[in-house]
Amino acid sequence: MATFKLVISDPKTGIAKQIEITGPEAEKLIGKRIGDQIPVKELGINLNELFGKEFPEDVKMEIRGGTDKDGFPMRPDIHGPRRVRILLSKGPGFRPKEKGERRKKTVRGNTISPEIVQVNVKLVY
């Protein structure tokens, strides 16, 4: 059974809240990709209680990224739930120290699997 830490960000206020989901709600996230949108009602999350303000009924969450059990970040350009070592020059998983620097880094694909522990989402109105 999957368990995820869900970091929900509200882009209008800049506030982010972290909750943990387990069971059938967490299973609904498996197989989703970065960029997919999920209705909040489908996961059974009460945003009004969590953020302390009113939200419209049709609010969706867009998956923006996450990390696996060993801390490797998800990248939107790597397809599937696999872990790979790739040569990076910028983007998620690598911050170059000097101009033109490239380095091999291990990153996770863009699909949520049971090995993922944290999922970052933003609210879409």
Curated annotation (Swiss-Prot):
<dbReference type="GO" id="GO:0003735">
    <property type="term" value="F:structural constituent of ribosome"/>
</dbReference>
<dbReference type="GO" id="GO:0006412">
    <property type="term" value="P:translation"/>
</dbReference>
<dbReference type="InterPro" id="IPR018282">
    <property type="entry name" value="Ribosomal_eS6_CS"/>
</dbReference>
<dbReference type="InterPro" id="IPR020924">
    <property type="entry name" value="Ribosomal_eS6_arc"/>
</dbReference>
<dbReference type="InterPro" id="IPR001377">
    <property type="entry name" value="Ribosomal_eS6"/>
</dbReference>
<keyword id="KW-0689">Ribosomal protein</keyword>
<comment type="similarity">
    <text>Belongs to the eukaryotic ribosomal protein eS6 family.</text>
</comment>
<dbReference type="GO" id="GO:0005840">
    <property type="term" value="C:ribosome"/>
</dbReference>
<keyword id="KW-0687">Ribonucleoprotein</keyword>
<protein>
    <recommendedName>
        <fullName>Small ribosomal subunit protein eS6</fullName>
    </recommendedName>
</protein>
<dbReference type="Pfam" id="PF01092">
    <property type="entry name" value="Ribosomal_S6e"/>
</dbReference>
<dbReference type="GO" id="GO:1990904">
    <property type="term" value="C:ribonucleoprotein complex"/>
</dbReference>
